[in-house]
C-alpha cells in the first residue's frame, strides 16, 4: 500500500506553526485532502522540545501572546476557538520583571498600557504620560502593519491613513524611543521585551 496519494487538493511545504495553522484553516473550510511536507522528523518548527535524563526541556517557544480570556479573546486565542481547539491556557499576569543589579531597578511590569506606565512612573516619577504615549505609538504602528501587509495602497494613502507608520519607518527602536526624552532608567525598564528577539535596540527596526 502506498503512503502517498497521486493527488492532493493542497500541498503545504513546512510543518511548523504556520504550515499547521494553514492546514487547520483549510480543514475548517471543508478541504480534506491536505499533505504537509516537513523535512524534520517532528512537526512544530521552533515550537519544539526534547527529553533528556527523564526531563522534558522546552527548546524555544514557551509563551504565546494575543490569547485573552474567554469571552474577550485576542487574535491568536480567537483562532484556536474558531478551529475548535480547546486549550487550558495558563495565564501569565505580568509581562515581565526587570532587574538591573547596581542600578536600583527591580520592578514587575503588569499587563495593560496604563498599568505598565504606572509601574514605570512609580520607579521614575514624572514619566507616566511619555511612557503611555510611547506604548500607544507602538500599538498604532502595529495596527498599521496589520493593514498594510494585506492591503495594496498608494504612498499618498499610506501617508494619509498611517502617518505614524510612515514617520518611524527606517528608524531603529532606540532612535524612536530617544525622541521621547525618557530617563535611561525608564528606557531600561521598557526595552527588555524588545531585545528578547535577539537584536540590540540599535539594530532592531522599530
Mark where each language-model region is.
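Rossmann-like flavin
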Residues: 102-205
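N-terminal glycine-rich phosphate/pyrophosphate-binding loop and immediately adjacent elements
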Residues: 2-140
